Amino acid sequence: MVSEKMPYEYLNTPCVLLDLDLLDANIREMTDCASDAGVQLRPHTKVHQSAWVAKRQLEAGACGIEVGIIEQAEAMAHQGLHDIVVGHPFVGEHKLATLKRIASNPRNQVWLVADMVEHALGYAAVARGVGRELPVLLKIDTGGIRRYGVPPGEPAVKVATELTRIQGIHLAGVYGHEHGAENTEEGLSSKAFEDATILCDTARAIRSAGVAIDHVSVGASPTFRWTCRFIKEGKFPEITEIHPGNCVIGDIGYMMNGGNRRESCAVTVLTSVMSVSHDAYAVLDAGIKTFGADSLIATRDAPNFFWEGMPSYGSVQGRSDLWLGRLNAEGSCIYYRGSGGRLSLGERLEIVPNNATLVINIHEKLYGVRGGIVEQMIDVTGRGVGS
């Protein structure tokens, strides 16, 4: 039986650890950066999916939270989180029914994102049905991710104008999400500046067309520090809110994108050695069902991406000579590639995953640890919700 205040070396493996000292430090960095710039912080919760973590972020000064999908918003609202941006536009009977349940509670302030008039028509029908007006943010495609978003400039002005004619919603502002920056200081600063410029220019164009909007929301983990710096320097007074997410948790993928440092990654997988019968590798009890299967293949041109033809699926704490090169459903092979010594049967390793979002979404609980002790068992509120 697992209990709080027990040394985490006694936990059954595999399991997921959340280093609370690193979590708190990452929350402070995000909050201080936004506060110093004089901009509101609304952290995206898509990685940790935890109401417990989100409440710590609010206690530190965040103005609210962001989720990706409407089902996650309902899960968070049930846990007492009431000011929520839903980052992805949506349509459909089931999703609109979920919105109706959320909007029927007057305590809930849900902000919706649209990039088509059709999205807003569905939201507005719900709003009229519950007798309240709902705020909508117009998603702008600033380049990079190429997913949701109306093109900036005149196309955005056209959609914004049409949204003002729909009874039941009000156009609150514009929303953008940076993606695709090169992981260099120049690349990150350039992308932050470019996207902020596109969004602010579009906001000014919408206002010049006679449409009053209050909010300009930007942000992503790799670029948020640069965005805050530019806001502090007075370059983008239109920006009211930033919404980075992953940097509060961190993983190898975001480290490679400039979103966090290796030493600030707060989540690790605790795993045990199940076999040392081979000279070249040991077998662990954590596989695809624990790590997911993200090899970060999009970064395959990076130096040392492959070793012996294998990508890595995570980074072992304190053992850079080990290579997590092969995953199966319920186990993995970790290879020796240096002189660090062979692993022992039953030995435990902590591994920073490539993709913390996948790892956390697989598990029902995280074990919050501090100083080697389990301090908090943390429910993954959004696990399996809407996915």
Task: Enumerate the predicted regions with their spans.
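Generic N-terminal amphipathic, Lys/Arg-enriched alpha-helix
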Residues: 1-18
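N-terminal glycine-rich anion-binding loops that anchor highly charged ligand groups
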Residues: 2-3, 22-53, 66
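Conserved, mostly hydrophobic/aromatic
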Residues: 23, 46, 76, 138, ...
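Active-site-proximal beta-alpha core segment in soluble small-molecule metabolic enzymes
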Residues: 44-183
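Active-site loop/helix belt of alpha/beta enzymes
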Residues: 142-259
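Active-site loop ensemble at the mouth of alpha/beta enzyme cores that anchors a bound cofactor
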Residues: 223-309
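C-terminal accessory subdomain/extension
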Residues: 280, 284-387
